[in-house]
Amino acid sequence: MGGGNMFTRREFLKTTAATGALAATSGLAAPAIAQDAAIKLGYVSPQTGPLAAFGEADKFVIDSFLSTTKSMGLNYEVVVKDSQSNPNRAAEVAKELIVDDEVNLILVASTPETTNPVATTCEVEEMPCISTVAPWQPWFIGQQGNPGDPTSWKPFNYAYHFFWGLEDVIAVFTNMWSQIETNKKVGGLFPNDGDGNAWGDKVVGFPPVLEKMGYALTDPGRYQNMTDDFSAQINAFKSGGCEIITGVVIPPDFTTFWNQAKQQGFAPKIASIGKALLFPQTVEALGNAGHNLSSEVWWTPSHPFKSSLTGETSSQVAEAFTKATSRPWTQPIGFAHTLFELAVDVMKRADDPTDSDVVAQAIAATKLDTLVGPIAWDGKNLPPFAAKNVAKTPLVGGQWRLKDGGGYDLVITDNKTAPNIPVGGKMEAIA
């Protein structure tokens, strides 16, 4: 059988359902979805495993979404799946949502290890998918058949993504570094995963930009996640005279690295780390040693945006989370909330929520002001190859500051990349 004639299981289900409906109505086409049938959303995120901090707010966001839509007279069902922080599991549960649960749209969040296998599965199965919380390069390039050959890259028909890119995080980090006097020697912590390979890439990652800006990068090579000994990296950074550390590290690994760096007498002036330092619990786990660690900041209670679904401000959503959970707010709250804002907006505009092509077209036509800023897949500030499938959101930089009574505050220290997001202070050296 030629590849062109291969039926996806989804097409088979759609065709048999349609012929069944026609037969049952003696030739009169039935409406595509019964008036009172729920619109079914699938949601995938890492709720357990080393990436679980990303999924901490999911239950709160989904519970709020279901009560909001119910009060608006909208009928939604959300089928939640845990990727267990495992890419193979993420692909499996995406297939389950499509084949067994027959969802109308899949939403997925948090790191390329979650977003990519889900988006790839959706693309193959012709299931519309909206993803977030992974820089767009590892999301888009990482799903290509040949990531090393840009001429072979193809856009997607069903997978759409919103977040910032490596160009943004590099700008944010170097803007923060320029506020402090250093020898411009940088140590890179890049693991052997989707993010690490992209951030450390000699073409799209940190190396070429840092070189152009006069920074000397010491990159000891890719390491495996869940490493328990960072002595080789620490020795390389000491030998290189590094006063700045950067990289993209999963939360448990940064705790190991930072504790070992302290024990081995390595004390950089700046540590700007992606991924690990997004979360208060990672910083709290370091005791006082988390003071003045810096990170990318994609959403905070002071972001000047409102939910299109509830009208709540960023600060109201963050307060509601803390009230419901007794936990400090975390950055993924804003993006998880926005996934559901987009779902409602898309389904409102899709004439037939059960038709994958109609839903995908509605996603492509989105123009929505959300809790994380304006979202439109219009190609703005993107290279042509990613213009169809990626929408960019703003990024700033911040530092964790010890509070008098214990715990930490995240203070925005640089907003050159998004001046509408207010700063709360200036960069301070760690030591």
What do the PLM-derived regions correspond to, one by one?
Residues 2-6, 28-46:
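C-terminal segment of N-terminal export signals and the immediately downstream linker at the start
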Residues 4-23:
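N-terminal secretory signal peptides and thylakoid transit peptides that target proteins
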Residues 42-61, 81-88, 110-111, 189-200, ...:
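Extracytoplasmic "Venus flytrap"
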Residues 53-60, 68-145, 162, 223-230, ...:
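Beta-alpha junction/loop-to-helix N-cap segments that form part of ligand/metal-binding clefts
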Residues 103-220, 270-295:
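Extracytoplasmic ligand/sensor domains, especially the bilobed periplasmic-binding protein
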Residues 112-123, 228-229, 235, 240-264, ...:
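Hydrophobic alpha-helical
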Residues 136, 261-337, 349-350, 413-419, ...:
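Extracellular/periplasmic periplasmic-binding protein-like sensory domains
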Residues 320-333, 344-410:
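Segments of small-molecule ligand-sensing domains
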